[in-house]
Amino acid sequence: MESLSELQNPLLDKNSKHMVMADYGYGGDFHSNQYQENIINYFVTGGGGGGGGGGGGGGVAVTGGNGKAKSQLLDATSLHLAVEAFYKPNFILYKDDVSGKGKDYKNECCETTFMEKKDKEVVVETPSTEDPQAKLLDENDVKIQTVSYEVEEEEYVEYETDCSSDSESEDNFIVIPPRDHLGLAIFSMLCCFWPLGIAAFYFSQGTSKAVTKGDFPLASIASRRALFLAALSITIGTGVYVGVVVALIAYLSKPGHI
């Protein structure tokens, strides 16, 4: 095949009068009657030549002018071109220069794309041409804010010891019953000022009774009263004894009494 028309129509005879001109494909739109006439002439007289593009493994029967059937070889790769001959062409094939202009037109076009991203993501992705080591350094420069505080363990320990001492004193106050001061009350009653000693002995017995009943507040009050009266009885008794001794010495020191 030496021309573009043979490439486009391999089944047509080289001597056919309906060959395509020059470097163009379908030259334009044909009238319907002329187009049908071309198809009929293709099947009636087109097979008289050497059979277009040879090489296919099949054939088709074509009736010649003398009424005899003649086999014509077909090219399997060019059958679609023969099928297109049955339809009216609606397009025009241009030369290669037009395709070159189309390529230039495509090259001149610019494509714009819209990307929906956050500002932070855009800022991170824009310096793609920069050095990756500089990017890593920028990431390492990011400061992380931390909050630190110190716990003063010494004050906490002191506070804990104070609480423990208070609790221990309260426990001791509750566990240890108040003293009745019975011995001191008896001494004050017998050896000192006996009226106050008797009163101290009375409160001492009241303290022991309150402890047995479990009434510790009342027992503590009675114990304090017994201690106070016993001490007062001893003080008064001591004063009485000292006064008696002084009076006796003064009386005996006079000269008329010997």
Swiss-Prot record:
User: What name does the UniProt record give this protein?
Assistant: Synapse differentiation-inducing gene protein 1-like
The uppermost taxa in this organism's lineage are:
Eukaryota, Metazoa, Chordata, Craniata, Vertebrata
- What does UniProt give as GO cellular component? Golgi apparatus; intracellular membrane-bounded organelle; membrane
Compartment(s): Membrane; Golgi apparatus, cis-Golgi network
Q: Which residues lie on this side of the membrane: Cytoplasmic?
A: 204-228
Its record classes its membrane topology as: Multi-pass membrane protein
Q: InterPro entries, from UniProt?
A: CD225/Dispanin_fam (IPR007593)
Does the keyword section mention Chloroplast?
Answer: no
A Pfam family this chain is assigned to: CD225
Which keywords does UniProt give here?
Golgi apparatus, Membrane, Transmembrane, Transmembrane helix
Q: Which residues lie on this side of the membrane: Extracellular?
A: 1-182, 250-258
Transmembrane parts of this sequence: 183-203, 229-249
Which family does the similarity line name? Belongs to the CD225/Dispanin family.
This protein's major location comes to: membrane
Q: Which domain of life is it from?
A: Eukaryota
